[in-house]
């Protein structure tokens, strides 16, 4: 569907308007096909005529899309969260490792990392206590040596 529109200004402006359908919606576009003048017209008048044609547009109505929600369980039964059954292993959810694993008795290689960390912390604690005892012995030995020197 196309229409021709003419405008009576000092010159004639012919626009070509067409309606297009896209996805169930209609859009109307207009293009200036030719501009002809019989005499000289100022640029201001030409811009006004183009501006007049540009502001005369039609609003297009768009159909809104609707979505239907289908239940995953047609019987209406919903499943609750999986609970821990009390057996050994990690909690049901661990960050970065995915879900589920609470009742399975743990996962071998992941347990080794925790054991290694605990062993390192235990070793550092032992070294800290050992250093405190060593410093205390040196202070006592130095204190006794100083007392012996003063008494002689």
UniProtKB/Swiss-Prot annotation:
InterPro entries: RF2K-like. GO terms for cellular component: chloroplast; mitochondrion. The keyword Transit peptide applies. The keyword Mitochondrion applies. Residues 1-52 form a transit peptide. Transmembrane segments: none annotated. Residues 52-69 have a biased composition (Polar residues). It is found in: Mitochondrion. Residues 52-101 are annotated as: Disordered. Keywords: Mitochondrion, Transit peptide. Its main location: mitochondrion. One of its GO terms (biological process) is chloroplast organization. Non-functional allele of the RF2 fertility restorer of rice varieties with LD-type cytoplasmic male sterility (CMS). Functional allele is found in the japonica cultivars Fukuyama and Owarihatamochi (AC F1SZ42), and indica cultivar Kasalath (AC F1SZ41). This is Protein FERTILITY RESTORER RF2, mitochondrial. It comes from Oryza sativa subsp. japonica (Rice). The gene is RF2.
């Amino acid at each position: 569907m196309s229409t021709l529109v003419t405008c009576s200004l000092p010159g004639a402006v012919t626009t070509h308007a067409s309606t297009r359908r896209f996805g169930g919606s209609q859009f109307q576009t207009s293009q200036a096909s030719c501009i002809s003048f019989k005499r000289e017209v100022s640029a201001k008048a030409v811009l006004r005529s183009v501006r007049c044609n540009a502001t005369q547009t039609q609003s297009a109505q768009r159909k809104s899309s609707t979505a239907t929600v289908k239940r995953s369980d047609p019987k209406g039964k919903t499943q609750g969260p999986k609970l821990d059954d009390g057996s050994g292993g990690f909690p049901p959810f661990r960050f970065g490792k995915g879900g589920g694993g609470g009742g399975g008795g743990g996962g071998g290689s992941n347990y080794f990392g925790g054991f290694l960390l605990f062993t390192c912390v235990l070793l550092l604690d032992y070294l800290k206590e050992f250093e405190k005892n060593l410093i205390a012995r040196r202070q006592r030995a130095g204190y006794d040596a100083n007392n012996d020197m003063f008494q002689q």
